[in-house]
């Protein structure tokens, strides 16, 4: 389930709801519902973040999740020509994620959650496979970990102390 909100026009961040979960606690007077939401925020140019929040009302959970996502923004600088520079295999808890670069025109070949994250990051051509756990939070954390471990040619040259004349 994905909903789109553009509440902050000035910062050009787009907000998507990845997962909404309803929890029920049975009390003496009946059932008491609470909601949790996993929110993704990005500008499709390399900045993105995610937030998780709980509240007694769905709208409050979504708002709090969006605020948490804006506080958790990261920048991905190693996106060259709409794809990633190299293959990466990352795992977080039980979720394992494989990202492979693709030729221009391929598009995003991935599952729904990973596709949304890659779109919001600004990736145009990539092949991704989610292995292991289907837990949404672990998949999102694995995707962020994979995108942050990417390094472009210049970064590798700097680490190896290769001077380009």
Curated annotation (Swiss-Prot):
Stored PROSITE patterns: RIBOSOMAL_S5 (PS00585), S5_DSRBD (PS50881)
Keyword Plastid in record: no
S5 DRBM domain mapped to chain residues: 13-76
Domain of life: Bacteria
GO BP, sorted A to Z: translation
Function, in words: With S4 and S12 plays an important role in translational accuracy.
Family stated for the protein in its record: Belongs to the universal ribosomal protein uS5 family.
NCBIfam families tied to this protein: rpsE_bact
Subunit composition and interactions: Part of the 30S ribosomal subunit. Contacts proteins S4 and S8.
Name used for this protein in its record: Small ribosomal subunit protein uS5
Organism: Chlamydia trachomatis serovar D (strain ATCC VR-885 / DSM 19411 / UW-3/Cx)
Organismal lineage: Bacteria, Pseudomonadati, Chlamydiota, Chlamydiia, Chlamydiales
Gene field: rpsE
């Amino acid at each position: 389930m994905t909903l789109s909100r553009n509440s902050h026009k000035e910062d050009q961040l787009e907000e998507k709801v990845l997962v909404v979960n309803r929890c029920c606690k049975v009390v003496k007077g009946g059932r008491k519902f609470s909601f949790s939401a996993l929110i993704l925020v990005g500008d499709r140019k390399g900045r993105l973040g995610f937030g998780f929040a709980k509240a007694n009302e769905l709208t409050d959970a979504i708002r709090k999740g969006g605020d948490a996502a804006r506080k958790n923004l990261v920048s991905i600088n190693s996106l060259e020509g709409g794809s990633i520079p190299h293959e990466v295999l990352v795992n977080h808890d039980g979720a394992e994620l494989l990202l492979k670069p693709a030729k221009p025109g391929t598009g995003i070949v991935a599952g729904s959650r990973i596709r949304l994250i890659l779109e919001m990051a600004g990736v145009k051509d990539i092949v991704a496979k989610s292995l292991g756990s289907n837990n949404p939070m672990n998949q999102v954390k694995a995707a962020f970990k994979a995108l942050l471990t990417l390094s472009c040619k210049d970064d590798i040259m700097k680490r190896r102390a290769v001077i380009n004349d």
